[in-house]
Amino acid sequence: MSREALIERQTTETNIRLKVALDGSGTWQGSSGIPFFDHLLAQMARHGLLDLKVWAEGDLEVDNHHTVEDIGICLGQAVKKALGDKKGISRYGSALVPMDEALVLVALDFSGRPYLAWGLELPPGRIGSLETELVEEFLRAMVNNSGLTLHVRQLAGHNAHHLAEALFKALGRAIRQAVTLDPREQGIPSTKGILS
């Protein structure tokens, strides 16, 4: 069973082609046009053992918002499509990741009910050319389009780069845990018999 998906999205603001393989080796290819955002996506892919390819063109001359948000939309849709009916998945995942002074906790559930509980205090400003406020926008778009319940908590830290990187590493590890197929689970991991 191949658990991968390709999503294409074209608007007047962006043109995005995104491919994800859930049972990958952690490879990243492509470009969003925003180097630090690419770095974060590469960290998520590597630590999630996801193969992620992103080709994006956006109206970066306006700002980065449309591109970052639309990549979140595409990633959410791709993960949802790749999971199919979610039969046999572990469903839940969590990770606690340090990076120097920063410590970030991510807990998630592929419940089919989108919800983002945001508990990260990224200082206003930019990391490279990425506005820190767009990290939350990316996650909200991903959550809303994947049906994911996601909790993010900052337990320590103040450096925006370290916090963002710890977050994306933790997100990758939690996704990896949640999408892993459990050989003992023959059906949908829910007493309802459905995750939607």
UniProtKB/Swiss-Prot annotation:
GO CC annotations on file: cytoplasm
Can you tell me where the transmembrane regions are? none
Enzyme Commission identifier(s): 4.2.1.19
Q: Which InterPro entries match?
A: IGPD_sf, ImidazoleglycerolP_deHydtase, ImidazoleglycerP_deHydtase_CS, Ribosomal_Su5_D2-typ_SF
Predominant location category: cytoplasm
Going by the UniProt record, its keywords in alphabetical order are: Amino-acid biosynthesis, Cytoplasm, Histidine biosynthesis, Lyase
Q: Does the keyword ATP-binding apply?
A: no
Q: Where does the record place it?
A: Cytoplasm
Cited PROSITE patterns: IGP_DEHYDRATASE_1, IGP_DEHYDRATASE_2
| Entry keyword annotation includes Cytoplasm | yes
Q: In which pathway does it act?
A: Amino-acid biosynthesis; L-histidine biosynthesis; L-histidine from 5-phospho-alpha-D-ribose 1-diphosphate: step 6/9
PANTHER family in the cross-refs: IMIDAZOLEGLYCEROL-PHOSPHATE DEHYDRATASE (PTHR23133:SF2), IMIDAZOLEGLYCEROL-PHOSPHATE DEHYDRATASE HIS7 (PTHR23133)
| Protein name (database record) | Imidazoleglycerol-phosphate dehydratase
- Look up and give the organism this protein is from: Moorella thermoacetica (strain ATCC 39073 / JCM 9320)
